[in-house]
Amino acid sequence: MNICKMAQEVHENARNHGWWDEDRSFGTIAALICSEWAEALEEHRAGRPNVWFACEEATESGTFICAPKDEFDCLEYDNIENCKHRSKKPEGVAVELIDGCIRILDWFGRENIRIAGPNTIEKLIRQAGHSYDNMELPDIVAWLNLFVSRAFFEHRRNITNGNKDSARKDACGHLLEALAVAFSYVANTGNDPEELLRMKHEYNKTRSYRHNNKVC
């Protein structure tokens, strides 16, 4: 998957859903990216899987994960992916990390970023190396927040000094680090980051305009 091409697809969908009806500051973008990392941490704290779908048939309050062990758990066991009660929305630790990546790609698309170095998910994962392989999710989230904070700092510093091109370039560099680590972590969970990215992007296409009038 070419990162720049996917960024344009993601940004087009964001525009179609009203997220760029008014321009947004880079600070807002950075905060929203970090909010996705925080949601990944909350999924981890709740002990939920990396990828899951809700069962919408359950009437009791709470979260019910669609994960039947056999036909005695659910009559739709053999047809689970087509079950009408299975939510279409992918959720979980890995999915929330992918959501953060989608927000980064949205900004890349907005700024028409062109990547000179590693420009595919596979290449970014190789760039991340093995330094993060044995880290727990909370440590990964801390690193991801650091990369985004660095991007925000460099962007603001350069904009303040009137260097718009440098602002984009420096912020992009740090956000690519975040993408590399997030994709690498997802891959190490046994999930395909490209497949998850495509899955969540396709779901996002079906969502309501501005997700029921969120302000940002």
Language model features with spans:
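Flexible "arm" and connector segments at domain edges
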Residues: 1-216
